[in-house]
Amino acid sequence: YQSTNLPTMHPDDRILVAIMNSRRDWALVQDEGWYRLPTKHAPPDAPHFEWLAFYFTKVFKDDKWAIHYYARIEGHELVTRRDLIPSEPDHPRAGQWYYKLQIGPLEHKLPPIVSLRGRRVTFILTTGDRFMNALEINDLFEQESPAGQVYVRLKELGIPVEREWWIDEEGIAYVVDLALPIEDGWLPVTFGDRPSPAGGLRFAAEAEPDACMREVQARLPAT
């Protein structure tokens, strides 16, 4: 399900990165050219995106934790799961609503966009320019906010850092803007009113990146 006559991705195109954690669903993408997006969990602006990319989870073994394929979205329908998979009319979610995203030929992302650590990912919204230039999943997020600028500076210094990282604290899971691996776990960094775990760093939403960098570096082990 690939072609040499492929559409062009533009810098400001909107791209949805979706989680692919089922080989059966991937077979449907390859063989039938559509992907189902549950409306109750759909990200903002759904289904109005130009492109769909797929983040493979651990079920894909050697290809796990990476984006290897993407495709142009050519249309969408609002349907129930029963309409999509009529062979399972009694499935518990048979009556739930989905966007059926109809896609064009699959394109191979080379090199793939990888996650340097196995990570939990929900939907990621990004743009054409970020997608085409990204080498790792963290590069897909915006880089203009204070959090984005701090990420870029840390990366330029060769300091490992993750963006939009899930923290699980006593059974409660939430996302922090930045997370830096340290000897005894993670140093979480949040901006604005996002939850901040004990021992983490919190900055104002419009904090000065230079000041943030000084505080972050002060918390890191000396090298």
What are the functions of these language-model segments?
Residues 8-173, 181, 206, 210-214, ...:
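Structured alpha/beta reader/binder surfaces that contact nucleic acids or chromatin modification marks
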Residues 3-7:
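Compositionally biased, intrinsically disordered low-complexity segments enriched in Pro/Arg/Gln/His
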Residues 192, 204-207:
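Residues at the C-termini of beta-strands that transition into short coil/loop
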Residues 197-204:
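Active-site regions of enzymes building and remodeling cell-envelope glycoconjugates
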Residues 173-197:
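Active-site beta-strand-loop-beta-strand hairpin of nuclease catalytic cores
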